[in-house]
A protein has these predicted regions:
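Cyclic-nucleotide recognition modules
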Residues: 18, 23, 69-127, 131
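A cytosolic small-molecule/anion-sensing beta-strand core signal
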Residues: 31-32, 50-51, 72, 96
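Short beta-strand segments in beta-sandwich/barrel cores
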Residues: 35, 53-58, 76, 99-100
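Short phosphate-coordinating micro-motif centered on Lys-Gly-acidic
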Residues: 35-41
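Polybasic "coupling" helices that flank or enter modular domains
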Residues: 113, 117-182
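Phosphate-/nucleic-acid-contacting segments
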Residues: 158-229
Length: 229
């Protein structure tokens, strides 16, 4: 993890702009797998992602995590725990090299306490995160594993995009794909093998290449038929 002094950045509208313009702002650089914060730790501050990506996850059992959300540039982390004054309810770890702007919990609370506009932005940011997580849960809750994976890939395409080689602009391990799809690692391997045989995707070294996007969309919408479970 590398620590840098605050620098001037292009400002966006909303809460992230307020954080970026704070005089005590600090920047951190987290490398892949570096931990921003852990579940049940007391919050130290607010993180605004400037570049890179972070997985928000919850421990289900020792060594077993469930990815709840994949956060990208412009998203704010740690807000709920800081505002409500309780421990982190989940953990955050970088999945790529990630640069964040950081403001301490005390500085942030001082910033918003006397400003109703800032309080409203906090509420909007919290609601947006909840909506995003709920949408992911709803989209996959009633699908079979192969449909869930197809839907997950569509979400990842929308979030990260594809490069010229039709590969996702994010590398994810089998474990991470399984966790975000809400299936087991063994099923995920079977699904990837099945999708490869069907000409939908290929997977190598963390990279997912999309071979047939229209068929992938069709698979995500299926409600019947053979499943891998």
């Amino acid at each position: 993890m590398k620590l840098e002094e605050s620098t001037m950045m292009v400002a966006n509208t909303g809460l992230e702009e307020i954080i970026r313009n704070h005089k005590e702002l600090t920047q951190f650089i987290f490398h892949k797998d570096d931990i921003l914060f852990k579940e049940n730790e007391h919050p130290v501050g607010i993180y605004c992602i400037e570049s890179g990506s972070v997985k928000i996850c919850k421990e289900e059992s020792p060594g077993q995590e469930r990815i709840l959300h994949l956060a990208i540039a412009g998203e704010i982390l740690g807000l709920h725990s800081v505002v409500n004054g309780h421990v982190y309810t989940n953990s955050a770890a970088a999945i790529t090299e990630t640069r964040v702007s950081f403001i301490t919990a005390s500085d942030f609370m001082e910033l918003i306490n006397d400003n109703n506009t800032y309080k409203l932005l906090v509420m909007k940011s919290l609601c947006s995160r909840i909506d995003s997580m709920e949408d992911h849960i709803v989209r996959i809750s009633e699908k079979m594993s192969d449909e869930r994976f197809a839907d997950t890939l569509l979400v990842l395409i929308e979030k990260y995009g594809l490069n010229k080689s039709k590969e996702l602009n994010i590398k994810l391990s089998i474990d991470e794909l399984a966790s975000y799809t809400c299936t087991s690692k063994s099923y995920m391997k079977k699904i990837i093998t099945e999708f490869t045989h069907r000409g939908l995707v290929t997977y190598s070294g963390g990279s997912v290449k999309i071979l047939n996007l229209p068929l992938l969309r069709t698979t995500a919408l299926l409600n019947a038929g053979a499943a891998i479970d």
